[in-house]
Each structure stands twice: as C-alpha cells, then as structure tokens.
Amino acid sequence: MQTVKMVITGPFSSGKTEFIKTISEIDVVSTERSITPDSVESQEKSETTVAMDFGRITVDNDLVLYLFGTPGQRRFDFMWEILAEGMLGFVVMVDSSKPETFREARSILETFRAYAPTPYVVAANKQDHADAWKPEDLRIALRIEDENVKLLPCIATDIEYVREVLLELLYSILEEMDSN
Amino acid sequence: MALKGNLAVFTTTQLLNLINLSKRSGSLTIFEGVETGEKMMLGDGRTQIDKLVAGKPLARLNFREGKLVFAEMQSKDGHLASILQRSGKLNEEQSRLIRQRAEALKMSDKGLALSLINANYVTQKDIIQSIQKHTVSIVFDLMTWKREPFEFKEGDQAPASRILVPIDLRNIIIEGTRIQNEQLELEKEIPNLDMALRFAEDPSSFKNIKLGANEWRVVGFINPKNSIRQIAKACNMTDTEIRRIVYALLQAGLVQMVKPQVEAKRRPDIRHPVPRNTPDRDVVNRLITKIKTINKTP
Ligand SMILES: Nc1nc2c(ncn2[C@@H]2O[C@H](COP(=O)(O)OP(=O)(O)OP(=O)(O)O)[C@@H](O)[C@H]2O)c(=O)[nH]1
Ligand SMILES: [Mg+2]
C-alpha cells in the first residue's frame, strides 16, 4: 500500500485544524492543548494544535492520502521539518481577516519552500468573515508575484472550498510534472 | 469588502503599493490608535502587540484608479491659502487676508483658486505644484506612522469642492522606501531594544546641552535597569522614535548602551531541504478522482 502526504500549514489560528477536520474521513487525530484561559491566545480560541493534526483520505485499497497540519505556535516549529519530509505539496492557510498574521504567513511560506521545492497553494481562509481581505489583495500583501502560485478563496468549514483547494494543489502538482 | 488593519502590521508603503498595483479607487482613512489594554496575537502564536482600536480619523487619502488624488491630515492645515503660503507663493499677510475673505464668502478651494488666478496672485501651475507638495508631505508623514488603525473603502469619491491633483504612487513609494531605509539603518545601529542605557558621565553634564522635550523625557528614564523598550513605552514613543533619540544621544557620547540583564534567546533557523518523494502521475490522478467525490455535509 502506498501512502502520500500533504501538509497544511499557516500562522496561528488560521484554520488548519478546521480545514483537515472538514475533509478527513477519520476524526482528526489532533494534539490540541487548551490555552490558559486568561492568556491572550485564548481571546482567539480555546485550543491550539501542539504537535500536529492528522487526517486521512482513503483513495482505494492501495492508496491513502494523509493530511498533516502543523502546529500554529512558533515554539513548536521544530515539527515543521519532520512534517515536510516527503510531502507531495502543501497548503498555506491564511486568516484573511487578520493582517497581523500576514508577515508570519509569508515567513512560513518561505520556510516550507526552503524545505522542499514542492508545489503549493495559498488558501485565503475565513472569506466569510466581514473583515476578510480579498485573495487578490492577499497576493499583493504576501508578495506572491509568481502568477503560477494559486491564491484561492477558502472557508475551512465548507467542504466545497476545502475540496477545491486540495484539487487545485493536485492540479499544480500535475502541471509541475508536465513542465519537467 | 473592507481592507482593514493597522500600520504596525501593514505599513503605509505596503498599503500604497497595494492600491497602486490593484488600481483601486476609494478612500483610505487612518485613525488615532486607541489603547484597549488588550493584546493582539501575531501569526507566530507567540508575539503579542498592543491591540488598538480606531479612534478619531487623523488623515484621509483619496485614490482614483490607483492614483492618489487628494490627501488631508488633521495636523496639517489644508486650506488652499495655507498651502500656498507654505510653498512660498503667498506671504503670511496675504494668506491671512485671502483666507478671511474666502471664509466670509464661503468660497470653496476651487472657487478661491479661480479668483486667485484671475487676480494674478498665482498661476495654475503654482496651485497644482503647491497642492502636490502638500499631498506628498502628508504621505511622507504617514510613512513614519507605525501603529495606527486604517480602513480602505472602495468607491468613496474625493470631496467635490477640493482641488484634485493626481499623483503617481510609484515615485512616492520609491521615496518612501528611502525613508524606511533610514529606519532600517537605525535598526542596525540599535538592533536590540532590550538593551539598557546608562550615562556616559555625570548626568550633570547634560546641563549645558540643548535637548528637545522628547529627548529630555527619555533622559529622565535612563537607568541600567530600564530597557530601551521600557523607556519607549513610558514615553509613549514608537520604536523608530526612540531609536532616533537614543541614536542621537549615543552619537553625542552622552549615553552608553549596556548589556541587557536577560539576553533574548534566539533559536537558529534550521533550513535544510528534506527528502522529497516524486509521485507518479497515476497517483495524483487517483487522488483527484477521489477528492472530487468527497461530499460530506459537515
Ligand atoms: N468564520 C470562520 N472561522 C473559521 C474558519 N476556519 C477556521 N475558523 C475558526 O478559527 C479558529 C481557529 O481555527 P483552527 O482550525 O483551530 O486554526 P489552526 O490554524 O488549527 O490553529 P492553531 O493550531 O492554534 O495554529 C477556530 O475558532 C475556527 O472555528 C473559516 O473559514 N471561517
Ligand atoms: Mg490547529
């Protein structure tokens, strides 16, 4: 049996766990940790991913796709390299409503690209949020000049969007094969 | 859709660049940053900065198809008579009288410009150049702002009574980058705001030195126990502002930088390529087929 993997990365609280939960056929094996109630993180949410998220999509008897979500807090970024190993491609999730996280998104993107030159897409997540920046604006804000890199609107709780993001990543992988 | 944020995380230059590249029309308002006492988490899930909410508007810029056409800033008198005076086209007395008359007659900037040109006070070119200068100076000011909330609203039109002078943003961005380079220089000179300061000699030597009010405020906090960052906070200064002052004090040999009590630990960035699996086309195609069929209802 063959297994392949994709990595879902992005800044703290950008929606990585949610994304994997929405499409995984198993309950996401998540290493969530409660955030201390009176800390700043907790204004955002009550739990954060500590080591990784882990989701699965079974294609057939001999092919399984694993989705790995990276932990959001930088103090756990020793995990990134391990997760990046052997990945087919990666998705950079960005909370489009939080410009304060764009710089980090850019830095994560760069780091992953340095780990492995695999194709990737950027998901402009939380497009349902009133303050969400448009994907076109995010492209400029994140300085993604390469037109071949797809910047896709996303709502991580909505399967339609999640499916589209993964499909676009797979199409990018095919395109890369064609160009080699 | 809104384009909201604050200048601490998305700079004026970045904003102008975005508006220029996307050929936007609309208005950009910069607000006073009001402290909430709350913190805002950056994307690393670790760094926190003060969370500011929008207070009263401090500046507004209008754009048409990516060009800057109008700017006003609360702290910069934008009356045409004052603008012409600042650029040397009117003297103080002329400016005062003209302004009085214009206000008495409830003249708009446009009407005033016309009558000034007709009366041969100034030329149309004078007016355009003066307004341009005023607009650009507002933008350069904004480029030094470091934490104010902003909001861009699409399609908002510039005030009809004002004289609109379209300015290509690219030149301003280039110039703005130069200004920011100055900041980078300062950051290189004073990279670590967690360092502390101490007097190079007896503080009484300051008596004969001319310092501005801001410098004095900083001097008042100099003590090996206070980090530069803490001083900035106490004086309500931005990082750049405190760096500028500390730099000047250092250059003048009045203060010395001393080691921070606790040096911030930095983990080296490990970035070596990891092994990569080259998948085969069949695998990717099977994945595509499978994912297309997934239709869970959440
Ligand atoms: N409105 C909206 N909320 C979302 C969306 N995606 C995620 N969220 C919410 O955003 C918060 C963070 O989502 P998570 O999936 O935990 O984010 P994460 O990236 O895994 O976070 P860390 O593991 O802490 O880095 C949660 O409250 C989610 O419910 C979205 O598309 N729209
Ligand atoms: Mg998570």
Where are the model-predicted features located?
Chain A
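Loop/turn-to-beta-strand initiation segments
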Residues: 62-65, 88-89, 118-121
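Canonical P-loop GTPase G-domain recognition
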Residues: 128-180
